[in-house]
Amino acid sequence: MASRGGNQSSDRQREHTPERGMGSASHPPPRPDRSPSQSPPPLPPKRNTYRRVGSNSSIESQVVLVSETSRSSLSPERSNSPPPIPPKKKPRKTKHVPLQDISQDSEEEREQVQLVRVGFSYPPVRIIEKDGKRSVEKIDNNDPISKGATSIAVRNPLSLPLVSAWEKGMEVMAVLMERYRLDNDLRTSFKLMPEQHEQYKRICHQYVNEEHRGIPLTFSSMKTLTAMMGRFMQGLVHSYSEIAHNNWECTGCALWAHGCTDYEGKVKCLHGTIMIQKDHIIEMDVASENGQRAMKENPDRAKITQNRWGRNVVQLANNDARCCVNDANCATNQFSSKSCGMFYTEGIKAQEAFKQYEAFMKAVYPGITPDQARMMLIPIHCDCNHKPGCAPVMGRQTCKMTPFGMANAEDLDVATISDPTVLASVRHPALMVFQCCNPVYRNSRVQNAGPNCDFKISAPDLLGALQLTRKLWQDTFPEIPVPKLVIPEFKWQNRLQFRNVSLPAGHYDSRQNPFDF
């Protein structure tokens, strides 16, 4: 009992003993400044901080919001422990921009929407508009719309195979080269290019030798005839395959409304103006072909005399020579830079040649109109300048036109001849002959002479070349009608003026630097 009482007294002493300035647990010290009903003071504003908490996976990461007040309110014991890991958040999915709606509508909804068009994709789709919104709808392969769209897309209205212009031309040329036995090198190298003219000439040459051997020509060479047939054949092939060139005529020809038969004794040049008359004297070698022809055709105007060097020459005085208006002040065989290069030694003979061609056209084509008969088919380019993109050459730019008289034609009896084509030459014994643009350069000893060739064909033979080319097409392709060959009408252009100076041209060089810097 005593021990129990002593223990109680010691416990009471402990209760009354304050610990470090504070009241006992059972009797805390009074707080006069605080009443039980007084509200607690306001808390300071929260300051939020962000802290990244990593997870075990390397992809996921979370952001945890931590309040500053919560940090301060934590007890020392709890502040030492790590904060609890918040629950993991699901990763946010990236939202893409929605594309056009692809929906499967019912049959009732199909009637309410408007069909815009049917696409050509596979599987097929149709693009429709509904409530102002355009959407794409998949179409089943068994849908009748899909079958109809497919048939419309591939159907050819002409029921013909779809081929290109190049393929059509190559098919025609393959048949021609096979029939007329061209060399393998010419066949393999042919690509239907504008500058490839040799194949056409070979085909026409073989055709003339096989089908028209010994064809009569008047003041024309066989080489020029086949060359012109090759040009016309190239024009037919391009017309059949619908190939067109903007700045180049493959035939090198034109239809000239010359008007040289409108007034008696007056002829016109390529400018369309009347040519002027001037005296002209020609001296030719006695042994030359031209000298002998001058003695036979003009015995009253030709005479043999000596020139200033003491040589015997045939001197032919032409008092009826005609020249272009721009060459009025130029000497013989001299042309100005504005000239067309046309010159006739005899104006009356030139007019007879134009009349002969007009009568010849009416005899060959009786249904032709008078205006069409007055249009002459003339070659603009000879072999020298008949190239795509060819630069102007020195001298004359068009073929030289020379009237040739037909000897002994006046002696024929008109009553004994029934062929109207022959009667045209009997009544008008002169032919217009087309030669190289600059035939004077052929025998010239000048070092800077321009190009020249042996191009020579008369106006009737040029028309015959066109007729033979059409005959060649009919014999080779009887099931295909002859294509239309549209030849342009001649119009004077400044690029056809006579050139006294040649333009400088460059040459190929393998080096990139000409001076090896």
Curated annotation (Swiss-Prot):
Q: Which residues bind Zn(2+) 1?
A: 269, 271, 324, 340
UniProt modified residues of type Phosphotyrosine: 180
Query: Among its keywords, does the record have Phosphoprotein?
Result: yes
Query: What are the record keywords, sorted?
Result: DNA replication, DNA-binding, Early protein, Host nucleus, Host-virus interaction, Metal-binding, Phosphoprotein, Viral DNA replication, Zinc
Compartments, as annotated in UniProt? Host nucleus
A Pfam family recorded for this sequence: Viral_DNA_Zn_bi
C-terminal arm, DBP binding: annotated span: 501-517
- Broad class of the protein's primary localization: host cell
Which Gene Ontology molecular function entries are recorded, alphabetically?
DNA binding; zinc ion binding
Q: Which Gene3D superfamilies match?
A: Adenovirus DNA-binding, C-terminal domain superfamily/Adenovirus DNA-binding, zinc binding domain, Adenovirus DNA-binding, N-terminal domain
Q: Does the keyword Transmembrane helix apply?
A: no
Q: Compositional bias (Low complexity) spans?
A: 64-80
Give the residue ranges for region: Flexible loop.
282-316
Assembly state and interactors?
Homomultimerizes on viral ssDNA bound to pTP. Forms a initiation complex with viral polymerase, pTP and hosts NFIA and POU2F1/OCT1. Interacts with host SRCAP.
Q: State the family it belongs to.
A: Belongs to the adenoviridae E2A DNA-binding protein family.
**Domain statement:** The C-terminal arm bridges DBP molecules together, thereby creating a chain.
* Protein's name in the database: DNA-binding protein
Species source reads Human adenovirus B serotype 7 (HAdV-7)
